[in-house]
């Protein structure tokens, strides 16, 4: 019963909340476990990924949810040694949301959707590999992948200074009919990208 309820929180959005909130560690670990049950689907990403399901972060807002899994060996060197080719920094799983590019939702045909079975509850989630690379000007950028090796979205990275509990922290802000997801990496870098309801 407990497992089914936890799954429903993220995968079917049965618990409505007034604003985005960070999910408890217990809930988040359960969700990460469910996403990893089908390893073939989880790891079938355009760039190689090795997500750490023991250090996840998840947020929810009504029918919407996001789960971020850091790369297992994510470190400051990942960013310091970044070049033109993207290096994985993790994965983000989205429920009821899809990335945006140039003000428009990324078409469903370009996104990788994974069917998740969580203790009797079933739902589809968009799974995006996350990478870091340098743009043409040598600046760090976050690249977000769908099905193909060409990223579906990009976001500039800025340097920050702070302490954080997890390798990647995730927060969200509503903006009319869309939202902005902000990712903080190791307390050293930050990137944000827009999301909205997925294409029907």
Predicted features by range, described:
Residues 19-96, 114-116, 147-200:
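Primarily secretory-pathway and cell-envelope proteins
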């Amino acid at each position: 019963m407990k497992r089914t309820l936890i799954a429903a929180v993220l995968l079917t959005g049965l618990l409505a909340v007034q604003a985005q909130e960070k999910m408890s560690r217990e809930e988040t670990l359960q969700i990460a476990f469910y996403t990893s049950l089908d390893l073939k689907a989880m790891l079938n990403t355009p760039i190689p990924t090795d997500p750490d399901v023991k250090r996840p972060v998840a947020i929810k807002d009504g029918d919407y949810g996001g789960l971020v899994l850091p790369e297992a060996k994510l470190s400051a060197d990942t960013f310091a040694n970044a070049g033109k080719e993207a290096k994985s920094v993790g994965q983000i799983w989205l429920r009821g949301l899809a990335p945006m590019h140039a003000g428009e939702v990324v078409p469903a045909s370009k996104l990788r959707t994974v069917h998740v079975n969580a203790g009797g509850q079933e739902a589809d989630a968009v799974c995006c590999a996350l990478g870091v690379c340098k743009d043409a000007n040598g600046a760090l950028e976050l690249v977000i992948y769908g099905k193909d090796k060409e990223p579906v979205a990009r976001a500039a990275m800025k340097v920050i200074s702070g302490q954080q509990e997890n390798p990647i922290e995730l927060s969200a802000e509503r903006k009319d009919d869309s939202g902005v997801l902000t990712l903080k990496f190791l307390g050293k870098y930050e990137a944000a990208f827009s999301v909205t309801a997925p294409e029907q």
